[in-house]
């Protein structure tokens, strides 16, 4: 998605060899207009997939997932990283490792929110090692829901997350694919949605 790549070039900050800071529009401050365009793009790509629910994990996946759900006219559900007192019913539970935070979190979704046979589009902010996405896939398997696709806002193609998801037979759409960081700049690989630009 050229609009997203341009924004990464303008406001993204490369930290070291493997971190991209995008807190000016995605991971801290949210540019709702950009998120709306991202949501529309995911909805375009998966328009014929029969999506019944959009699922993400808190926190930075919520904005793009919400706009994708709005464009598809379906509910959006986010997996919570901390159980609260109102989550006292049956839970779908798994553990995910965060590459950026360097920690493992237990994530959960109320089992009554995902029904057997639901066709789920998983959306997340970043794809690095694939752990968050695979964790959400595992939650959907527990619910006997079908994952019809995974939409990633930004993918670090130099890490192994993409291959892990493809090896699982998943349909993957990344709107910005980073081939590498070079001299503090982002070098992009062709995005999966290039036909829509």
Swiss-Prot record:
Location of the protein in the cell: Cytoplasm
Biological role: Converts the preformed base xanthine, a product of nucleic acid breakdown, to xanthosine 5'-monophosphate (XMP), so it can be reused for RNA or DNA synthesis.
GO molecular function, one term: xanthine phosphoribosyltransferase activity
Organism: Lactococcus lactis subsp. cremoris (strain MG1363)
InterPro entries (UniProt xref): PRibTrfase_dom, PRTase-like, Pur/Pyrimidine_PRTase, Xanthine_PRibTrfase
Pathway: Purine metabolism; XMP biosynthesis via salvage pathway; XMP from xanthine: step 1/1
Catalytic reactions on record: XMP + diphosphate = xanthine + 5-phospho-alpha-D-ribose 1-diphosphate
Any single GO CC term annotated in Swiss-Prot or TrEMBL for this entry: cytoplasm
EC numbers for this chain: 2.4.2.22
Entries under NCBIfam families matching the protein: PRK09219.1, XPRTase
EC category: transferase
HAMAP family with a match to the protein in the record: XPRTase (MF_01184)
Any one biological process term the GO annotation gives: purine ribonucleoside salvage
CDD domains according to UniProt: PRTases_typeI (cd06223)
Quaternary structure annotation from Swiss-Prot or TrEMBL: Homodimer.
Binding site for 5-phospho-alpha-D-ribose 1-diphosphate: 128-132
Name recorded for this polypeptide: Xanthine phosphoribosyltransferase
Binding site for xanthine: 20, 27, 156
Similarity comment text for this entry: Belongs to the purine/pyrimidine phosphoribosyltransferase family. Xpt subfamily.
């Amino acid at each position: 998605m050229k609009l997203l790549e341009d924004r990464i070039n303008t406001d993204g900050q490369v930290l070291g060899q493997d971190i991209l800071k995008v807190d000016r529009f995605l991971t801290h401050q949210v540019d709702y207009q950009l998120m709306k365009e991202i949501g529309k793009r995911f909805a375009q790509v998966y328009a014929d997939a029969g999506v019944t629910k959009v699922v993400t994990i808190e926190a930075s996946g919520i904005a793009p997932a919400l706009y994708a759900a709005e464009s598809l006219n379906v509910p959006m559900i986010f997996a919570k990283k901390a159980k609260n007192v109102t989550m006292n019913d049956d839970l779908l539970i798994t553990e995910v490792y965060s590459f950026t935070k360097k920690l493992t979190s237990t994530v959960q979704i109320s089992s009554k929110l995902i029904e057997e046979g639901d066709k789920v589009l998983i959306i997340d902010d970043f794809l690095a090692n694939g752990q968050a996405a695979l964790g959400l896939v595992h939650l959907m398997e527990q619910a006997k829901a079908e994952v019809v696709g995974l939409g990633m806002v930004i993918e670090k193609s130099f890490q192994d997350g993409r291959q892990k998801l493809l090896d699982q037979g998943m349909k993957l759409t990344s709107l910005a694919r980073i081939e590498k960081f070079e001299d503090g700049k982002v070098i992009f690989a062709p995005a999966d949605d290039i036909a829509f630009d």
